[in-house]
Amino acid sequence: MKHNNVIPSSHFRKHWQNYVKTWFNQPARKTRRRVARQKKAVKIFPRPTSGPLRPVVHGQTLKYNMKVRAGKGFTLEELKVAGIPKKLAPTIGISVDHRRKNRSLEGLQSNVQRLKTYKAKLVVFPRRSRQVKAGDSTPEELANATQVQGDYMPIASVKAAMELVKLTADLKAFKAYDKIRLERTNARHAGARAKRAAEAEKEEKK
């Protein structure tokens, strides 16, 4: 025994052998899942195996909001700017989320660009081989098309490059905490000072 921990006393009574959890089905379950993935890939051909295209979103809360991840679906505004009708989007492998709202121009533009890149690479098979409609791909593109396995257009988190500066005498003399306190005080008294200045100006005019 080490450290100030509780001395373990195993409470093995009440026919504990009957309550032992076993995992003997794990290898077979792994095989079943693999076979199911292969069957699904054949069934949804020529669509990508990893499902529809998802937008790039920031995680919620202070802990995760600096990280980007895949969201549920593109907003109606993003689809509108990209020039894709909202009824057409789910039929060509683009997920739509009518609840999500765009709260920044940067996020909107990045997802619109993502949609445009996807649309440029997209190969659309006709519903019926003999009836080719507007928007369907050419026979040459259809002949060369392959099913995308795994993730496509992966979301990569880009880290901002830090710029190193030389430490000068001014930087060494700068008191960061004092500066923060001063600015906080100025912000707190800003309203009262502005009011006092306005009253003084009014007195001068008299």
From Swiss-Prot:
Disulphide bonds in the chain: none
One of the GO BP terms on file: translation
Keywords linked to the UniProt accession: Ribonucleoprotein, Ribosomal protein
Annotated region (Disordered), positions in chain: 186-206
One Pfam short name: Ribosomal_L13e
Taxonomy, superkingdom: Eukaryota
GO cellular component annotations of the record: cytosolic large ribosomal subunit; cytosolic ribosome; plastid
Composition bias type Basic and acidic residues, residue spans: 196-206
InterPro entries the record matches: Ribosomal_eL13 (IPR001380), Ribosomal_eL13_CS (IPR018256)
GO MF annotations, alphabetized: structural constituent of ribosome
Protein family per UniProt: Belongs to the eukaryotic ribosomal protein eL13 family.
Protein name: Large ribosomal subunit protein eL13x
Underlying gene: RPL13D
